[in-house]
Amino acid sequence: MGKGARSRKERAQEQEQKAAQQQEQKGKRRLRKALCGLAAILVLVLLVFGLLYATGTLQRHMTAMTVGDSKISGEEYSYYYNMLRSNFLSSNESYLSSMGLTSSTLDDANYTEDMTFGEYFRQQTDSTIRVSYELYNEATENGYEMSQEGQENYDANIQAVKDAAKKSDISETKYLQTVTGVSITMEEYEKILWKDALGKDYYENTQAKEYTAEDLEAYYEENANQFDLADYRVFQVFFDAEDEASKTAAKEKADAFAAAVTDEQSFIDMAKEQAAEDQVEQYSEPDGTLTEGAALSTSGTVIDWVKDSSRKEGDVEVLEISSNYSVVYFIDRYRDESESVDVRHILLPVAKDSDEEAKAEVKTEAEALLEEWKAGEATEDSFAELAREHSSDSNASKGGLYTGINESTNFVDTFKNWCLDESRQVGDTGIVETEYGYHIMYFAGSRPTWESSAEEALTNDDYNAYLDEMDKKYPMEQNDKVIDMVI
């Protein structure tokens, strides 16, 4: 019985061991299944992450920069960057083409000696976003509500996108993505535009100042070098920079010339008599030595001497400039009293490859808009409102206003010629064709150039001073890794 009992006991133990082993094997199988499941999930997560990263979706929703407590996504940063770059390309197409630069080669080319175009666009994007959020944050913090004019401007801009999308027979989101090059929805675009519009409206209606004639006069007196012009004459005596004897002889000739000058006419006569062989043609003319209307806002050896506040008519000086000695005769310094004009316009664009029929359609549309304005109140304010609704120019939000236009303004000739026509009267209208399309014009008035320039400078000074305070209140931080991935 003992042996049999032991056998049964052993068999029971063996069965228990087998059961335990089977349970252990089941546990291992369950663990392997669980681990396999986790691995599959991890692979899927990595695949999704990789897909989001590869398509840029992840980066676009990461924070690219902050302004105070506001977070700017990579997508929004990309929108601002692309729009700034696109506007620069379209505005400077002729210049860039003459420099042999294209959209694909532009970013690595030098904008200045120390900055590439790509770095310039990045800098401008940072600044634009910062200002937009600073003004928006101030508006919301102070409980500001959009003005009626601001709301109308915003609505007009949104409607312009909707109309353009409808005309192109595509969705609004698709249109925006085509124009901006960013995966942005209409809803996201409206939010960006609203922030920008509310901030600008807040500043213009609560912070911007209006200046009196006395304000402008005082600003001019304090900053005359920014606005004054000067007339002077220059006679140059060249030398070989590597030949000391040549340099000494040139200095002696220049000093003798200066010492012999008694008045402006003597300067003219001596320049003609002492001209080097290659200067005879230039200095034989009475105006060969003359510089008129030189802007004192610039700098240089001659200009720095001319704009010295102690300078008086008849002053003569010999100045060394590179490889010549320049004898300079001061004639006059004066405020620019020439007239500059203010105009409003509505741009209806014409594509470059448009045929005559397409151009005629746009011209007809321009004529109809002008007649619509004439049939209404026909005031400058009503014209400005029409510009906000219909103009494709970048200044549409300002009612199509351009100020301070004069002969030196870099505008298309046909546009500038209409503005500067001496017969022009306040309230005059017309239609001007340029390479950009048809412009419906409104002449708003004229005033002395110095006054227009002083108001613009004073406005900018006050605006920049305000932004300096905002920069302290809303510090900016950039996430360079995200930015580099989205631009």
Which residue ranges define each predicted feature?
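Secretory-pathway/luminal and periplasmic proteins that interact with or process carbohydrate-rich
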Residues: 160-171, 228-229, 276-285, 393-400
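Short linear loop/turn motifs
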Residues: 150-162, 284-292, 400-403
